[in-house]
Amino acid sequence: MSKISEAVKRARAAFSSGRTRPLQFRIQQLEALQRLIQEQEQELVGALAADLHKNEWNAYYEEVVYVLEEIEYMIQKLPEWAADEPVEKTPQTQQDELYIHSEPLGVVLVIGTWNYPFNLTIQPMVGAIAAGNSVVLKPSELSENMASLLATIIPQYLDKDLYPVINGGVPETTELLKERFDHILYTGSTGVGKIIMTAAAKHLTPVTLELGGKSPCYVDKNCDLDVACRRIAWGKFMNSGQTCVAPDYILCDPSIQNQIVEKLKKSLKEFYGEDAKKSRDYGRIISARHFQRVMGLIEGQKVAYGGTGDAATRYIAPTILTDVDPQSPVMQEEIFGPVLPIVCVRSLEEAIQFINQREKPLALYMFSSNDKVIKKMIAETSSGGVAANDVIVHITLHSLPFGGVGNSGMGSYHGKKSFETFSHRRSCLVRPLMNDEGLKVRYPPSPAKMTQH
């Protein structure tokens, strides 16, 4: 038996022992994870700096703080969520107990991603632990420093059998997917998401797939362009554009395209200076392969700003493209880099049509001072989530589930939705053995004639 199979077998045995069932045990494990973050914060920040060139402030406020907040929220709310939930009774069930009981699914596989390798690996794990599951954790091999660190420190704080960390690349992930799990959560590309779902189908394992897509950003003529462009520039170029819910491209009327370019440039210079390469706040591309892919998308385009790169350091300058042809390569795949195309449309209706002709994105953004424009855009399009007059922040809230639709994924998590995703809501009816006389009508033999209703 391979090491991977042995780890999954131990996780299954540990879950079957029943020790994750008591809420106190789950809370103890969440508190241990809390201590891990607090005591290993410098090591976590160092790994993020090595993998993605994140400085201490960005590492903490883009990744670490959200996990700490999620843990605190789970600990606070767990007794309420885990309690049996009474449901409405009928006249025939007045003497019965009717309720929904949340039970853990079993052994959950969480396959993390590299762009936010701490947050997007550990935050789903928090929900799975709170729901009482065993969790097999597979960090992304591309963020190798974080993957190595997690494999070292998690066993020092959490139950070693219940929460194993498996490192490796495609061969190890392929082997993992041959095992039987009770739920799989994967964050990454649509192509790999299809592979995950195919593997899960063998055992009818439910999946949560957090995928990507080209998240549109419509900028209406009727809005404060200074504010809009500052917020767009922040969300797009954070982490060097490597954010699954980053605005992928802008849709706007041609009459305001030049204004948008100038205001984006102004914000970028305020954020990162004249040379973003020297900025401690500006990230780097994760790998040489991704660097070449993103640089290739710029070729042949009309560059209004940036467009340069340094392969040795995997740096790509903040780049704005104008008058982009919707059929060009940069509009055919999720960019996942610091390149912002602008596509011109003549009306709100044309923007909606443009969005609806493409796969459903993970996020949809719009900037307008007109509530009717915002309501129309939301009503007539589909996406995993929406933010109006801002970007990205909707995924940071406990109260809003984070997930995709169609090609951008299925299922969701965050806050209470995480607990529900990793739980089976079991319908329960408990009936007394007395009063069987009242049930005689259901027993054979049935009457020869139907009575009048």
Swiss-Prot record:
CDD domains: ALDH_F3AB. Its EC number is 1.2.1.5. The keyword Lipid metabolism applies. Coiled coil: none annotated. The modification N-acetylserine is found at S2. NAD(+) binds at G188, S189, T190, G191, V192, G193. It catalyses: an aldehyde + NAD(+) + H2O = a carboxylate + NADH + 2 H(+); octanal + NAD(+) + H2O = octanoate + NADH + 2 H(+). One of its GO terms (cellular component) is endoplasmic reticulum. High levels in stomach, esophagus and lung; low level in the liver and kidney. Its main location: cytoplasm. Keywords: Acetylation, Cytoplasm, Lipid metabolism, NAD, NADP, Oxidoreductase. The modification N6-acetyllysine is found at K178, K194. The keyword Acetylation applies. GO terms for molecular function: 3-chloroallyl aldehyde dehydrogenase activity; alcohol dehydrogenase (NADP+) activity; aldehyde dehydrogenase (NAD+) activity; aldehyde dehydrogenase [NAD(P)+] activity; benzaldehyde dehydrogenase (NAD+) activity. The active site is at E210, C244. Belongs to the aldehyde dehydrogenase family. Homodimer. This is Aldehyde dehydrogenase, dimeric NADP-preferring. It comes from Homo sapiens (Human). The lineage of its organism: Eukaryota, Metazoa, Chordata, Craniata, Vertebrata. The gene is ALDH3A1.
